[in-house]
Structures are given as C-alpha cells and as structure tokens.
C-alpha cells in the first residue's frame, strides 16, 4: 500500500510539473539587414538587477528557446546582448511566449580601456575581416586593403576570389546594389569608412533555397562604420603635371587626373556615384564591367552573344601595367542607387557611361611555323581608338523565405572606332566601326511551399552588330560590311522536392533564336571565294533536365542530365539553299564534394557532352576580320563530343590565417572538323576542313597563403600549369602540336614597425611549343618583380618608393632587362585633405618587349612606354 501511494504521488507531481512547463521562443535579427544573429546572449533577469535566472544563446538563424517551469512575474525581463549591438530588454508577460527581437548596431565604448579587435573572426560559415587590422595610412580604397587579407585574391580587373573561388554576390550592408559591377564599390569606397569585410563561404543567394540547394560559392558583405552611415561621405582628387614626351621639352603641363565619389548608405536607401577622368594612363574603364553574372552558360543559360566577324583593336599588354603604356583621355561616370521597398524587397538602378580615347604604338615580329617552312611577318602599329559605352540596369528583387521574384531590364550600347596605320611586311591603313547594341529583360519567379519549389524564368534579348572595315594599301582598297542581328528568348520552369537529405528537380525549357547576317566584301581578288553572305538561322531548342542533390554528413553530391532536342532552319538567301536538321543531345554531369573536416573540403566532378552546333559559323562567303585575315564558315550539323574530369581541394584555418587550394582538370574534345589556315598572297584564309581531329587540355595548380601576425603581413605562393595538345591544318598539310605554359607567383608583404611597410611580388612564366611533325620546339621565359616601400617619418608625412624589374625573352637565347622606378611623397591634414607629389618612370625608359605563343605562332612584341612624369595632386576624404 505504501509503495502504491508513493507511486501515485510521483505521477501527480510529474503531471503537475509538466503542466507548468513553459517554453519561450523567438528570433533575434539585425535591425538593418533583417538577417538572423547567431550568438546573442538571451537571459532572464530582474528588471532592477543583474542576477541571471536563466540563459541561452541564439542559433545560426537567430532563433532561441528557453524552457521554464513557469513564466516569472512582470518584475523580470528578457535581456538581449551582443558585442557591437545595443542592449535590448523586454518585460516578460504571461500572455506572450514568442518574441521577435531586432537589435541595432552600436559601437562598444569602454572608459579608459583600449580594445583591439581580432583581425579575423569566424562565426559559423561567416568569416569577418577587421579592415583596420590590415590597412595602413597609404591605403585609400577598399580594394587596397582586400589585397592584403589572407585568403583573398583581387585580380587586375577587380575580380575577387576567396581561397581560389570567385564570389557569387557582393553586398553592402546586406543589399546587392551593384550586381556584378562590384569594383565600383571596392575602388571608390574609402577603407576608413569600412568596419569589416564578411565572407560567407557557402552562400545561397536565394533565401527560399537555403536549406534545399547547397552552394559552394563565397559571397562578400561590406559592413560600414557607424560614422559612414546615413550621411554623405566620399572622396575628391585632382591633379596635374608634366610628362616628358618624345620630341618635346620637359616642363609643359600636359597631364591631369580628377576623381570624385559621393555616396550615402542609409537603412532605406543606398547611393554611390562616381566620376573619374584622366590622361595619365590609368585605366578606369573596367570599373563598370560585370565581374560575375547569374545568366549561366551552355544550353540552360542566357549567355548568347553575337560573334564579332570584324575585330580590329590595338595590341594588348601582358605582365606590365597598362598605365605604363596607355596614352589616353578617359572619362567615366556611374550612378548607382538602391531603394528598400520592404523587408525583403529592393529596387536598384545602375547607369555607367565610359568615354575612352587611346593612342598606342607597338612593334611585333610574328613567325608562323609550317611543316616545310616558316613565314615571317613584321608589323609597326600606330593606332587610335575611340570607345563610348552606355550601360543601364534596373532591377526589382524580392527575396523572401517563401518566394523569390526578380526582374531586370538592361541596355548595353557600345561604339568602338579604330584607325590604325601598319608599316612592315604589309603596309596599310585600317579604319573600323564596331558598334554593339543590346537590350534585354529577365524575369525570375520562385515559390516555395513546405518541401516543394516551383520556378518560372524567362529571358528575352535583342542584339545587333553593324560593323564595317576599310583597308587601304598601295595597290587597292578593300571594304567589308557586316550586319548581324538576333532575337534570343529563353523560358523555363521547374518543380523541385526536398526529401531530406535529397533534393530532386525537373526543369524543362525552350530556347528560341532568330538570327540574320548580311555581309559584303569588295577590293580583294574574286579568286579567293564568294564575297557576299545573306543568311538566316532559326532554331527552337526544347530541353528537359532532371537534377538531384544529396547533402548530409559532410557529403554533397549533385547530378544533372540535360537532354535537348533542337530543330534548325538555315536559309542561304543568296544561294537559294535551305539546310534543315534536328539534333538530340545528352550531357550528363556529376559533382561530389566531401568535407573531410570543417577545414578541409574536396570536390570531384566530371561530365560527358555532345556540344551544341555553333550555328554562327554557318556561312559560305568570305569575311574580312582585319587586313590580313579572311574567314569562311562551314555548314555542318554534326555535333562535337567532349568530356572532362576535375578535382579540387581546399583548406582553411581563418583564425590562424592559413588558406590553401589546389586543382587539376583534364578535358578531351573530338571534332569532325579541323581548323585550317592557308597563306594565299597577302592574306591568311581561315576555314574548316572536313576531317576529324581531337585535342586535349590539362590544367593544374594551387595556392597557399599565410598571414604573418607578428609583422602584420602576408606571404603567398601560387603555381599554375596548362598543357594543350591540338591539331591545325596549314596550307593543306596537317600539323600536330603541343603547348605548355608554366606560371609561378609569390607575394610577401608586412608592416614590421608602425612607420614602415613593404610589398614584394614575383611572377614567372615559361611558354613552350612543340611541333610534333618536325620534332621542333621553341620556348620563352618572362620574369616580373615588383617592390614597394612605404615610410612614415612623421605622423602626417608619407614616402613611397616603388620599383619594377622585368627580364623577358625577346628572341632565342636573348633576354632583355627593364627596370622602372616611381617615387611619391604626401602630407595629410586633420581635415582629411592630403597633398602629394609623384614621379613616374624616373629612369625615363622607353620600350618594353616580350614573346608569346599561340597556335603554331610565335610573336615578339615591343611597346612604347609613357615618359617620365611629375604629378602634383590634392586628395580629400569627407
């Protein structure tokens, strides 16, 4: 009886206790971005005291749970605190168990205590770099500091990679104002206005897919300082000086530069406007270029563009900076705005205008290696190029947890005029007009219902390229006109299911193309071929792509197998010939990733494909690309085959500032056609020969970087290797060849003492070409080194010394050394103003040369450098 009584008493007490059990839950978000905050301390404490009664921390998505026997009375509060955010307290109520809390950022101030933030912090998949830890007084833009951060790579074009992977989004305070044109921000936002740079290592930009579709791509979010928010900030720069031009006296004011950036980043709106103008060689035209795009590639992408049948442009440099050679007048302005229409809805606009006038002078000596001889061409080129470009994008985006809507209206209008005088083997004067016009609209819809997603996407674009080329020589005048135009439409829909850990999806779509091309060539011998083209091409490409993903236990596996059916309708209006065909192609792909540890990830991927027909090569008449090269197409619907396999491995220890990645990729291609070129008189006839050929590519490389905390520096080493085995038919004789390219890079930077920092960079490459038929090989090596010293003798006085050394092979067993030196000094004032004096090319070096290989061709190039320049400028940051 006693045992029965105790048992009943225990049951009653347990039931009573369970009945009183209460769970408080909720979510804590950033008041500005709306993103969930991880690691917020949530406590229950008396309203008038600090004694903690119960506590927990928020999860990765900002959610929290607190289990209580009963809700305390109204004299207790929920207390939310996190470093960098204002504390928030909410009185407890017996009627409320779910709380939605917004925390506002706030600088943490400690009386009489100096707190030094860690240079790198990690929170889940997000790595935060403290900008102040990597910046010094000589750094102006955010890009200057990004280059010093371990794991970061910033190319000369402004593209950002994190541990070897290109970023897929760039945010400013959680908003995507610039799309893929993020170098506008990195080159114009002053580093002193940025508090931190956040890297989201596995970023899924569509919130509704965050737990359904895994992404391995990183993204960057710029966190501004509180002092740079909700007010106008920016920079001003103006300067002028003298360049010692050939044949002119030194002392004439003939160079200038001006820059202005004005921006405001508030909670509900963002604005970033820039203007840059100079004739000192600095290339700012690339700031408005897309550095990434979500248009995709291949059969399921929107990347269709018209081919440039005419293409004449000044020679492009490698290794050395463009600013050493560019003789320019450049003006660029950008207007970028974003308006926050709702919690997840943004409207953004971008307008970019570029005007660039460029003079160039170069010399080249080209060798064409044939089986029975070598052909030599010499060119002395003097070119004048004028480019104008206007780009406008208007984008509406709603990115919620249940639905995603985005619509982008774009226009890209470009004008490109070139006049070029050629002396040497084939003296001539070329004049070319190459405008390009494109307008497009892209709509993306996604709806998520529990474990299911539905998408609908449509993209429509119209593009036209009316090009013309005239070539005058001592014997005749040749004229080529080409007008190509296309309407491209792509619509697809998909249905996906999330059956954890699997995601399966079926996507079906239709691409429609209607393209015309009309050309007329005169002034070349009729014996070379037909001089006119007037063709039309239409296709309707239907496809279905089953896709499946597995994501669990460190494994991420993705498989897709697009199947396409394409009827083609080709009409040669001049020949009165119609050639129609239908093709069914399959291209399965598999990718397997495994996180061996939280720091080490490996990915193996591969695929087999039948490549889509290159219908823009469907033409019969000749087209003159430049004064020397004529092209003719080939109408053939046979599909080429390809396969590839790749392996990537990456390792990171952010808090120890160690990053490493390596890759290897092998690809094979089988074609039913062989690329052919024949040397006929003054011309090279480029065409296709109906004979099967194959090629192979091998790429391998890696990079290791390590932060040097003891000297506030960085050391990195990288290596890349590229091998190509191919086949080319020259003068009706087959030539098998291979090329090898080796590239080594290294960087060492540091700030061992407060008043001195340095940066050293090394780049070495070797090109080798082998003609297998003859057993002949040729190679060249190039070495480039850069060394920069920055001194700070006084708090506001700075001195910069910069040197460059190049050792390039210009002929067999013959190298040329070139040393360039610059120096500058500046003085800063408390109001943000800075005066500087800069001397460029102190030794007044005049030429730069190197050798390159490409497709059984070896070319030695030499360029005219800008002369010694003295520039005085004033800079102001406000």
Set out the residue ranges of the language-model regions:
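Face-selective signature of the C-terminal outer-membrane beta-barrel domain
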Residues: 338-356, 384-423, 427-571, 595, ...
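Membrane-proximal, glycine/serine-rich, low-complexity loop/turn segments characteristic
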Residues: 20, 61, 71, 83-93, ...
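Short Pro-Gly-centered beta-turn/loop motif in secreted/extracellular proteins
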Residues: 38, 65-74
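N-terminal secretion/transport leader regions
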Residues: 24-29, 37-46, 77-83, 101, ...
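Short, acidic Ser/Thr/Gly-rich low-complexity loop/linker segments typical of extracellular
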Residues: 48-65
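Outer-membrane beta-barrel translocator domains and adjoining extracellular loop/strand segments
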Residues: 210-212, 247-249, 284-290, 359-376, ...
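Conserved C-terminal beta-signal and adjacent last beta-strands/turns
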Residues: 743-766, 774-878
């Amino acid at each position: 009886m006693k045992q029965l009584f105790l048992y009943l008493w225990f049951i009653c007490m347990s039931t009573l206790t369970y009945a009183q059990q209460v769970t408080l839950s909720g979510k804590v978000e950033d008041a500005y971005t709306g993103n969930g905050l991880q690691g917020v301390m949530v406590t229950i404490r008396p309203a008038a005291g600090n004694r903690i009664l119960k506590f927990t921390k928020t999860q990765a998505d900002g959610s929290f749970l607190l289990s209580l026997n009963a809700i305390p009375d109204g004299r207790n509060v929920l207390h939310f605190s996190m470093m960098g955010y204002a504390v928030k307290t909410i009185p407890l109520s017996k009627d409320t168990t779910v709380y939605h809390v917004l925390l506002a950022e706030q600088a943490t101030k400690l009386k009489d205590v100096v707190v030094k933030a860690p240079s790198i912090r990690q929170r889940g998949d997000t790595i935060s770099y403290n900008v102040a830890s990597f910046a010094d007084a000589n750094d102006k833009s955010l890009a200057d500091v990004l280059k010093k951060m371990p794991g970061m790579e910033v190319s000369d074009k402004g593209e950002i990679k994190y541990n070897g992977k290109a970023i897929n989004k760039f945010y400013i305070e959680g908003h995507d104002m610039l799309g893929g044109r993020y170098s506008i921000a990195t080159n114009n936002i002053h580093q002193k206005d940025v508090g931190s740079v956040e890297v989201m290592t596995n970023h899924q930009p569509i919130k509704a897919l965050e737990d359904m579709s895994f992404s391995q791509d990183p993204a960057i979010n710029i966190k501004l300082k509180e002092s740079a928010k909700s007010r106008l900030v920016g920079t001003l720069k103006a300067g002028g000086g003298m360049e010692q031009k050939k044949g002119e006296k030194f002392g004439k004011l003939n160079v200038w530069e001006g820059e202005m950036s004005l921006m405001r980043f508030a909670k509900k709106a963002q604005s970033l406007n820039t203007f840059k103008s100079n004739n000192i060689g600095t290339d700012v035209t690339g700031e408005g270029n897309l550095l990434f795009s979500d248009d995709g590639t291949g059969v399921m992408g929107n990347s269709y563009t018209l081919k440039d049948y005419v293409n004449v442009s000044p020679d492009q440099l490698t290794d050395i900076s463009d600013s050493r050679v560019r003789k320019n007048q450049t003006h660029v302005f950008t207007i970028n705005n974003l308006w926050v229409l709702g919690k997840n809805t943004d409207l953004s606009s971008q307008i970019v205008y570029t005007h660039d006038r460029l003079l160039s002078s170069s010399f080249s000596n080209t060798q064409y290696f044939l089986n029975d001889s070598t052909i030599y061409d010499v060119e002395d080129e003097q070119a004048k190029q004028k480019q104008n470009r206007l780009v406008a994008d208007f984008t509406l985006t709603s990115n919620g947890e249940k639905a995603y809507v985005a619509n982008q209206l774009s226009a890209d209008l470009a004008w490109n005029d070139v006049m070029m005088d050629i002396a040497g083997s084939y003296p001539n004067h070329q004049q070319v007009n190459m405008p390009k016009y494109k307008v497009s609209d892209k709509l993306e819809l996604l709806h998520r219902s529990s474990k299911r997603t539905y998408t609908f996407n449509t993209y429509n674009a119209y593009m036209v390229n009316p090009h013309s080329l005239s070539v005058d020589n001592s014997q005749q005048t040749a004229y080529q006109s080409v007008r190509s135009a296309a309407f491209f439409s792509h619509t697809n829909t998909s249905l996906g299911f999330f059956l954890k850990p699997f995601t399966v999806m079926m996507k079906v779509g239709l691409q429609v193309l209607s393209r015309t091309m009309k050309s007329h060539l005169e002034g070349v011998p009729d014996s070379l071929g037909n001089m006119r083209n007037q063709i039309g091409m239409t296709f309707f490409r239907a496809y279905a792509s089953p896709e499946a993903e597995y994501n669990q236990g460190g494994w991420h596996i993705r498989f897709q197998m697009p199947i396409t059916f394409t009827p083609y309708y080709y009409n040669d209006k001049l020949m009165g010939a119609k050639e129609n065909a239908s093709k069914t192609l399959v291209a399965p792909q598999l990718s397997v990733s495994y996180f061996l540890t939280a720091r080490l990830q490996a990915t193996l991927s591969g695929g087999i494909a039948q490549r889509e027909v290159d219908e823009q090569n469907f033409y019969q008449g000749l087209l003159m690309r430049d004064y020397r090269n004529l092209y003719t197409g080939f109408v053939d619907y046979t599909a080429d085959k390809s396969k590839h396999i790749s392996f990537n491995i990456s390792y990171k220890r952010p808090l120890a500032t160690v990053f490493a990645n390596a890759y290897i990729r092998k690809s094979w291609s089988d074609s039913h056609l062989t690329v052919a070129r024949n040397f006929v008189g003054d011309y090279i006839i480029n065409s296709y020969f109906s004979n099967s050929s194959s090629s192979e590519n091998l790429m391998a490389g890696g990079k290791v970087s390590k932060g040097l905390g003891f000297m506030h520096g960085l050391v990195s080493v990288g290596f890349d290797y590229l091998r190509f085995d191919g086949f080319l038919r020259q003068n009706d004789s087959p030539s098998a060849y291979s090329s090898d390219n080796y590239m080594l890079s290294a960087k060492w930077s540091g700030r061992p003492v407060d008043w001195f920092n340095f940066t050293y960079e090394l780049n070495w490459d070797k090109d080798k070409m082998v003609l297998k038929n003859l057993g002949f090989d040729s190679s060249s090596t190039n070495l480039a080194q850069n060394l920069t010293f920055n001194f700070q003798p006084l708090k506001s006085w700075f001195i910069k010394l910069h040197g460059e050394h190049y050792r390039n092979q210009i002929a067999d067993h013959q190298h040329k050394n070139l040393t360039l030196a610059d120096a500058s000094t500046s003085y800063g004032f408390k109001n943000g103003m800075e005066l500087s004096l800069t001397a460029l090319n102190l030794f007044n070096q005049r030429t730069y040369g190197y050798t390159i290989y490409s497709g059984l061709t070896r070319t030695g190039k030499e360029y005219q450098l800008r002369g010694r320049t003295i520039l005085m400028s004033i800079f102001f940051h406000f």
